[in-house]
Amino acid sequence: MVALINQLQPKTLDWVGTSMGGLIGMVICGQPDLPLPVKVRKLVLNDVGPALEWTAIQRIGQYIGKTGQFDSVQQAADAMWAISSSFGPHTPEQWLALSQAMVKPSGTGYTLHYDPSFAIPFGTATEESTKQGEAMLWALYDNIKAQTLITRGAQSDLLSVATAQAMTLRGPKALLVEFAGVGHAPTFVAPDQAKVVVDFLLGAP
């Protein structure tokens, strides 16, 4: 990711990361000496933090990395919805539109469009290793200087209320916004969710 940012040479840099993308954002923002053309200005951590709930990691590990084979985009969307109801209410049209970016043609059908090796950390993680990693992630978080927003699904099983509240008191002392009726993780399809992020990114430093 550092190599990509250096290749792009952005004039300004904001980071919006959900789940794993948020963890990568914490790693980058928590290391101010990384050779980047610019520092991250604003950071959005979507339903993720330094401490993650083990039961949620186990749940995600049960399906992540399985690419599947589908006859149509709609069939793929239906399969993803079956394991994604925690994303909160979506109309069928919204979910289909969201799903289209997640599939790719494969032979005569479709498969999920991501690297299955993404699942390796979930497959090798243990409750003990997850706890051990928390200290490192908290150290990175405490070192973040970017203005930070945490968005959390009020029913999230990955980012606990206690962790989210602790993140508002230490490190960058993030702003916390929760969305009712949503678990892990908000998709920002709903206008009220998108507005929170847009207002944060476009607002005054």
Identify the meaning behind each predicted range.
Residues 4, 196-204:
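C-terminal alpha-helix
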Residues 9-11, 145-146, 173:
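Active-site acidic short loop of glycosyltransferases
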Residues 1-7:
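Alpha/beta-hydrolase active-site loop
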Residues 182-192:
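Catalytic histidine-centered segment of alpha/beta-hydrolase-like enzymes
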Residues 67, 71-124:
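Conserved alpha/beta-hydrolase catalytic His-Asp/Glu region
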Residues 7-54:
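Conserved hydrolase catalytic core segment
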Residues 4, 46-86:
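Internal catalytic or translocation cores that form aromatic/hydrophobic pockets or channels
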Residues 104-169, 178:
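Conserved serine/cysteine hydrolase catalytic core
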